[in-house]
UniProtKB/Swiss-Prot annotation:
InterPro entries: PSI_PsaI (IPR001302), PSI_PsaI_sf (IPR036357). Belongs to the PsaI family. One of its GO terms (cellular component) is photosystem I. It comes from the Eukaryota. This is Photosystem I reaction center subunit VIII. It comes from Phaeodactylum tricornutum (strain CCAP 1055/1). The lineage of its organism: Eukaryota, Sar, Stramenopiles, Ochrophyta, Bacillariophyta. It holds the Pfam family PSI_8. One of its GO terms (biological process) is photosynthesis. The chain crosses the membrane at residues 8-28. May help in the organization of the PsaL subunit. The keyword Membrane applies. It is found in: Plastid, Chloroplast thylakoid membrane. Its main location: plastid. Keywords: Chloroplast, Membrane, Photosynthesis, Photosystem I, Plastid, Thylakoid, Transmembrane, Transmembrane helix.
Length: 36
């Protein structure tokens, strides 16, 4: 039963967290590169 709606929870989390995390890491990398 849990496996039935697990993808419905997992997909939005991956779809929202992964792009946000990659954007945050890129922003931090750009800031560090700009400062130095």
């Amino acid at each position: 039963m849990a496996a039935s709606f697990l993808p419905a929870i997992l997909v939005p989390i991956v779809g929202l967290v992964f792009p946000a995390l990659s954007m945050a890491l890129f922003f931090i990398y750009a800031s560090i590169d700009d400062i130095s």
